[in-house]
């Protein structure tokens, strides 16, 4: 479904508190990176292939950019609107399936029309070699927003639905998403701001998720491919709009916080140590490790969804590289 205006208003109010207050140094030359083309790029999610090739999405432009290894240029790889896509959010390289997974959503009611008129929320799969669309799966239900995803050991894809307390699953070879887990623990705030967001597997085989507006961090026990106990973990400090989450091995992760930082996340039992790697980033929305480097998308989404209030974005749009041990 398209996002209702009350949802949009409450979302924007929560999403960009802090991001709008970032100092100008967030856009200064202390960070390197890859410039994205145009004055309307607004990168949202970023993923990487094993060879270091980057893929970047955009809710404003749609489609997917590709950045080849050792290159400082982003090229259009998936054309905006291709394979009935619209505004693009989460992206994930699935090496085993040779696919790039892409979340496609309709943000027209938020004043972001996207490159097509396709309504609804979809998970799309594109051939990593050719860029050809291969898989299209509509999110089930009425309240749907495809946000982010992770691949399980058996090749199943697990997807967060940010408008319902659901983790969805797409089994290998299937084109139909199913509700793998639905639980009140993941409920959105009363005003309807986004709930489930980042998702990753830990070295213990369990699933870890965060909630954007509430700033919670959960472990979902997984046994035999089925969900078990849900545990709300205890971060060492409050989380500020936690977003993209990626594993770095064992019980360690990296995470983007919309409040302006990218973090190292270490899970020890029910405790979560949050260590800021880099702050004063321009509205980070996603992060992916490539070797000892973190690539982070500077979303600047307040300037897209609240243009009148926030004014024009800081150009150029970028994805930035941050040393893992910064």
What spans do the regions from the language model cover?
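Bacterial N-terminal signal peptides that target proteins for export
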Residues: 2-15
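A short beta-strand motif characteristic of beta-propeller blades
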Residues: 30-36, 73-81, 132-139, 178-190, ...
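Beta-rich, blade/repeat-based domains predominating
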Residues: 37-53, 59, 82-108, 139-157, ...
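Conserved beta-strand positions in repeat-built beta-propeller and related beta-rich domains
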Residues: 55-60, 94, 100-118, 157-163, ...
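Structural signal for beta-propeller blades
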Residues: 62-65, 108-111, 123, 165-168, ...
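Short loop/turn segments that connect beta-strands within beta-propeller blades
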Residues: 68-72, 127-132, 171-175, 221-226, ...
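Asp-box/WD-like beta-propeller blade repeats and closely related beta-sheet repeat scaffolds
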Residues: 114-156
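Beta-propeller blade signature
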Residues: 118-129, 311-325
């Amino acid at each position: 479904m398209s996002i209702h205006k009350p949802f949009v208003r409450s979302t924007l109010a929560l999403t960009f508190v802090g991001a709008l207050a970032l100092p100008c140094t967030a856009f200064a030359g202390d960070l390197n990176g890859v410039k994205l083309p145009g004055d309307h790029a607004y990168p949202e999610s970023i993923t990487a292939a094993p060879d270091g090739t980057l893929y970047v999405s955009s809710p404003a432009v749609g489609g997917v950019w590709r950045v080849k290894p050792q290159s400082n240029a982003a090229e259009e790889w998936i054309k905006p609107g291709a394979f009935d896509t619209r505004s693009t959010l989460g992206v994930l390289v699935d090496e085993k399936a040779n696919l790039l997974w892409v979340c496609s959503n309709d943000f027209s009611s938020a004043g972001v029309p996207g490159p097509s008129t396709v309504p609804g929320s979809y998970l799309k799969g594109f051939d990593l070699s050719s860029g050809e669309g291969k898989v299209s799966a509509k999110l089930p239900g009425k309240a749907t927003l495809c946000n982010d995803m992770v691949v399980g050991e058996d090749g199943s894809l697990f997807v967060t639905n940010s408008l319902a307390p659901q983790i969805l699953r797409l089994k290998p070879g299937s084109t139909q998403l199913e509700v793998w887990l639905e639980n009140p623990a993941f409920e959105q705030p009363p005003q309807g701001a986004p709930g489930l967001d980042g998702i990753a597997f830990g070295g213990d085989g369990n699933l870890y998720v965060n909630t954007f507006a509430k700033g919670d961090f959960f472990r979902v026990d997984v046994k035999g491919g089925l969900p078990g106990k849900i545990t709300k973990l205890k971060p060492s400090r409050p989380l500020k709009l936690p977003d993209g989450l990626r594993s770095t091995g064992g019980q360690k992760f990296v995470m983007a916080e919309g409040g302006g930082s990218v973090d190292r996340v270490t899970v020890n039992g029910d405790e979560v140590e949050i260590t800021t790697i880099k702050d004063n980033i321009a509205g980070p929305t996603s992060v992916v490790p490539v070797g000892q480097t973190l690539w982070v998308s500077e979303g600047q989404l307040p300037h897209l969804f609240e243009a009148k209030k926030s004014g024009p974005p800081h150009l150029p749009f970028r994805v930035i590289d941050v040393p893992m041990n910064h």
